[in-house]
Amino acid sequence: MSVFVKPSAIELTRIAEANIDYGKRTNNTMIYPIVIYGSQTLRNPSENIAPDYPDLEKLVEDMFLTLGEADGVGLAAPQIGKNIRLFVVDCTPWGEDHPELADYRRAFINAEIYERSEETSLFNEGCLSLPGLHEDVRRPVSIRMRYVDEKFVEHDEEFTGLPARVIQHEYDHIEGKVFTDRLSPLRRNLLKSKLQQLAGGKYRCSYKTK
């Protein structure tokens, strides 16, 4: 998860055929390098986006491309170096087991979670900004959230299940948090050396990073 890691890789032939370079625009598209744990960008507060934000729909499209190339299911703007309140979610990899998610691709702008269920659940999360690290994280089962989409249409919705899980993970990013912040002090202490290695650039992953 900023992202979850997809349960299975998806072959993005349209990207390969376009010969897109990371960090460069080709055929009017761009795949961004992912910001890794240790960068202050992941801790800075994110600002709301105005309706006249330059090329907003294009940025959303590029974020989905970046997400797909990295085999993730969620990506927040701070993970590509932009401290704005924007994240995208693609739950389609779960579509085979959960048909209702077969076409679930959404963009969330200026999101505000204002209600969380008392019921919680554990789920094993990962993050593109913390490659190689996966931990069981407890979160509310359902949430209510206000947001606007890439067309700046306002929404007020309830989310449950896997979408609620991914949304909360990405929402943390625009709040300057990462999923390890949700772990117990004891567990965080046990992960201290791994987190230091990530911050020091000692990691391996299949996508471009910065």
What function would you assign to each model-found segment?
Residues 4-168, 173-210:
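Active-site rim/adjacent substrate-binding subdomains
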